[in-house]
Amino acid sequence: MIELERIRGAAERARPHVYRTPLMPVDGALLKLECLQPTGSFKVRGFFAAALALPEERRRAGLITVSAGNAAQACAYAAHALGVPCRVVMYETAPATKIDGVKRWGGEPVLMPRPAVLDWLTNRGWESGPEAFIHPFADPEVMAGHGGLGLELVEDVPDLARVVVPVGGGGLIGGTASAIKRLRPEVEVIG
């Protein structure tokens, strides 16, 4: 589990750049509307938290990540807002909307065939450039930033009993569950 102070610090760093999203009641449940974030997903929380945790000199060199989806856009958006360059390694088959989203925020998509992306990851290809690599879901600061969502749920829903979290790479549930369990261990978190 991620430490509560790390989550609070990450959420505080990201706060000026993300929205505290509302909850919408639907059939007895509450939906956290992260689709209202600037890039349409929760990913901006983690990328701002991670980028702002970097030493300033390292951050100024730029950001780099690997993603064919929402993390790609979140990295580009965070870099744009912080005034630093960004490259995103993407599968050449990435959806055009995601490639365009990276470009819209001034990021540079680096399109590669799938085997080349996997080789780049295996061989730590990001070390050949000056940018700071932010893993799209396994970076501890990314997960802590996503934990801000859990903090908001605990604050906004006094009778919180159960939280259902979608799971892809695991960064969202890692951060959200850590925040919730640190504050309210009796709450059931389902992925």
Which role does the model predict for each range below?
Residues M1-G191:
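PLP-dependent amino-acid enzyme catalytic core
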